[in-house]
């Protein structure tokens, strides 16, 4: 995503990256970064939680409008309401996808 953000920025369009991996976004030189400690797939918050989603969006817009230097990073001060380990477990499907299943099988067959 940071590479895409820089490409869009080169066209004159400002961007902000909302990410669960802000340190990686910094390493990849994303122009503006909002770090969130949320499970993957939920960058703006819990499904149907409009208050949490709005806080994430408002911070992203403030960073977009107010960042004065390249690679500005601001972390959202909101905790996921469920322990992250439990949230990740819930997020994972009960059965692995065909490609993950094949990968796991190939690992088992290695000496």
Predicted regions and their residues:
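Short, acidic/small-residue loops that bind anionic groups at enzyme active sites
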Residues: 1-28
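Surface-exposed beta-strand edges and their flanking turn/coil or helix-capping segments
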Residues: 30, 47-51, 88
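Short, hinge-like loop/turn segments at secondary-structure boundaries
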Residues: 32-37
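A charged, well-structured terminal subsegment
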Residues: 43-72
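Extended, histidine- and acidic-residue-enriched regions that form the cofactor-binding/catalytic faces
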Residues: 62-111
């Amino acid at each position: 995503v940071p590479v895409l953000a820089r490409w869009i920025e080169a066209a004159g369009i400002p961007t902000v990256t909302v990410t669960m991996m802000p340190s990686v976004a910094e390493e990849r030189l994303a122009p503006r970064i909002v770090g969130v400690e949320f499970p993957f797939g939920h960058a703006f918050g819990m499904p149907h939680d409009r208050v949490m989603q709005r806080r994430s969006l408002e911070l992203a817009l403030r960073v977009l409008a107010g960042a004065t230097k390249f690679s500005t990073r601001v972390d959202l001060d909101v905790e996921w309401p469920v322990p992250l380990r439990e949230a990740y477990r819930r997020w994972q499907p009960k059965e692995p996808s065909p490609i993950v299943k094949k990968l796991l099988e190939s690992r088992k067959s290695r000496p």
